[in-house]
Regions:
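Positively charged n-region of N-terminal signal peptides that target proteins for export
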Residues: 1-4
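Sec-dependent signal peptide cleavage junction
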Residues: 15-28
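N-terminal "first-domain core" detector
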Residues: 28-106
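Domain-length functional cores that host ligand/cofactor binding and catalytic or interaction surfaces
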Residues: 29-32, 90, 110-121, 129-311, ...
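Generic short beta-strand segments
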Residues: 97-107, 315-322, 398-401
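Calcium-regulated, polybasic anionic-phospholipid
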Residues: 316-363
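C2 and C2-like phospholipid-binding beta-sandwich domains
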Residues: 323-335, 365-385, 395-441
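Tryptophan-paired
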Residues: 343-390
Length: 444
C-alpha cells in the first residue's frame, strides 16, 4: 500500500482525551463502552445523486428485511440515523466496531460503481488500563476494501499496513469522515479519519451520538447542521446472516440496482494487500488483524474474554514431516494451510519450517521459525478465529513450500465441525500419509 503517513509533529498536535487519572467506579458494559467511544461522523453529501442516499440509517429503515427494495424506497421512508456496533474483548483490549449503512452506493458512472445497499465502517482498539472506559490506542477504517490505520501513539509503527495519520477527538468521540456518493471513483461512503477540513463541495452534515435517531432536514453548509444517531448492536443482522432475503451469498448483501450483489457485510470485507489478515478478520479476529497491520503495540493479548462473532476457532498445535518432498530428496519446507468452506485461513506467512527433518515434531507459533511474514507478532499464539458458514467443511492441509515451482501437497485432515462441537486431531496422519498434525477446531 502506498498511503501518506503524517509526520510525527502532526500526530503530536492532534487532540486525544486522557483518562490516566480516571477513578474506576465500575466496569463499563459493552453498550456503555460503545456509547462512550461512539464516533462523531462528518458525512459529506451530494445532492446531484439524491442527498438522502448519503444519510446513514438501519438496514430495515423501510420497515422490512428485504434487501431488494432499499434503493427504491429511499424517498418513501425517513432514513433515521443509526450505527451498527459490536464489541470483542481480549485480556488487554476492547475492539469496538462501528458500521455505517447507506441504502444506495451511487456514482456518476452508473452502472459502474453504483449498487444497492452499502456498508463501510471502522473499529477502535481500546487498551484496558483499569479505568472505566480504557484508553484509546488506535483506529482502523474501511473504505472500499482498503484498510486505513490511525493512531496518536508515536510508538506504534507500520506493519503490513502503513500508519496513515492521527485521530482528532470531540471529547471521547473520534472524528471520522464519510465520503458522499460520487466523491470517489471506487464508490461512496468510504470512512477515514476526519482531518479538520471543510466539506467537499461545501455541503455536509455531522452525526453525533445522542441515543436518538434523527432524520436530517437541512444539509446546507459545511458541517453546520448536527443530527443525533442511535446505536444498534449487530446481533440483529448477524442472526439473519443466512437469510436469502438479505444476502445473495455468504457475507454479500443482495442488490439488483445497477451492479448487482455488490455490497459486503463486515464479515465479507477483504483488503487484498494487507498481509496475512484475511477476509473478515476485522469481524472474527480483530486482535490478529491489528497485530498484522501494525507494530509497537506493547502488551497485546490474543486471548479473548468475549468474542461472539466467529464461526470457527482453529488452533494449530504441531506438525511433523514424514517425507522429504523437496527436489532431489531435500527436506520438506512445511507449512499448514487451514481451509473453511474452501477458503484458506492460514498459510506460509503465519508459520513455516524450512528443511524440516522427518519424524521431528515442530510446535507452531505464528511468526516463528521461517514464517514468511517474519517475527512481527506481539506474542506467541497459534489460533485464528474465522467467520464462515456453519456446518461447512474444515480441512487442515500440510504443504511443502517450493516457491515458484508449485507447493507439494503432503495430505490433509478433514471434518465438518457442527456448531457447539469440537474436533481434535492428535498426531493425526494426513490423507496421503506424508505428515502428522495436531490441531483443534471448535465451532459456535
Amino acid at each position: 500500500m502506498k498511503k501518506l503517513v503524517l509526520s510525527l509533529m502532526s500526530v503530536l498536535t492532534l487532540i486525544i482525551p486522557f483518562f490516566t487519572n480516571a477513578i474506576t467506579t465500575h466496569a463499563a458494559s459493552y453498550s456503555e463502552l460503545a456509547a462512550h467511544w461512539a464516533p462523531q461522523i462528518y458525512q459529506d453529501v451530494n445532492a446531484d445523486l439524491d442527498v438522502r442516499a448519503d444519510f446513514i440509517t438501519n438496514f430495515n429503515y423501510d420497515g422490512d428485511y428485504l434487501a431488494l427494495n432499499n434503493w427504491d424506497n429511499l424517498l418513501n421512508y425517513n432514513e433515521n440515523a443509526y450505527v451498527y456496533y459490536k464489541v470483542s474483548e481480549t485480556l488487554t483490549h476492547y475492539f469496538i466496531e462501528y458500521d455505517l449503512f447507506h441504502a444506495r452506493d451511487d456514482a456518476y458512472t452508473r452502472p459502474l460503481d453504483a449498487h444497492e445497499n452499502d456498508f463501510e465502517g471502522l473499529f477502535l482498539v481500546i487498551r484496558k488500563d483499569g479505568s472505566t472506559y480504557g484508553t484509546f490506542q488506535l483506529m482502523e477504517t474501511m473504505a472500499h476494501n482498503q484498510w486505513y490505520d490511525y493512531t496518536n501513539d508515536p510508538s506504534i509503527t507500520s506493519g503490513s499496513d502503513n500508519v496513515d495519520g492521527g485521530v482528532l477527538f470531540n471529547g471521547s468521540h473520534p472524528k471520522v469522515f464519510c465520503q458522499a456518493n460520487g466523491q470517489s471513483p471506487s464508490g461512496g461512503h468510504g470512512v477515514k479519519a476526519y482531518d479538520g477540513s471543510s466539506a467537499p463541495g461545501g455541503d455536509g452534515i455531522v452525526y453525533d451520538y445522542t441515543g436518538t435517531a434523527q432524520f436530517p432536514t437541512n444539509t446546507s453548509g459545511s458541517y453546520t447542521n448536527h443530527y443525533g444517531y442511535a446505536l444498534i448492536e449487530w446481533g440483529d443482522l448477524w442472526n439473519r446472516r443466512n437469510d436469502p432475503n438479505i444476502f445473495s451469498s455468504w457475507g454479500t448483501i443482495a442488490g439488483n440496482n445497477h451492479t448487482a450483489n455488490s455490497a459486503n457485510a463486515p464479515w465479507g470485507w477483504d483488503d487484498s494487500d494487507d498481509g496475512p489478515a484475511l477476509q473478515g478478520m476485522n469481524w472474527s479476529d480483530p486482535a490478529h488483524q491489528v497485530d498484522v497491520h501494525l507494530n509497537g503495540l506493547g502488551n497485546f493479548s490474543h486471548t479473548y474474554v468475549v468474542n461472539p462473532y466467529f464461526s470457527h476457532k482453529i488452533v494449530l498445535q504441531n506438525v511433523q514431516s514424514l517425507e522429504d518432498r523437496d527436489p532431489f530428496g531435500g527436506k520438506s519446507d512445511v507449512y499448514i494451510k487451514a481451509y473453511v468452506n474452501g477458503q484458506g485461513q492460514t498459510d506460509a506467512r503465519f508459520w513455516k519450517k524450512n528443511d524440516a527433518p522427518k519424524n521431528q515434531i515442530f510446535n507452531i507459533a505464528f511468526g516463528a521459525n521461517d514464517a514468511e511474514f517474519g517475527p512481527n507478532f506481539s506474542e506467541n499464539y497459534n489460533t485464528v478465529y474465522v467467520a464462515k458458514p456453519s456446518n461447512t467443511n474444515v480441512e487442515i492441509h500440510v504443504y511443502d513450500s517450493d516457491g515458484t515451482s508449485g507447493d507439494d501437497d503432503m495430505g490433509y485432515l478433514s471434518a465438518v465441525v457442527a456448531p457447539g462441537t469440537t474436533k481434535t486431531w492428535t498426531d493425526a496422519l494426513t490423507s496421503n500419509g506424508q505428515a502428522k498434525v495436531s490441531a483443534v477446531v471448535s465451532a459456535q
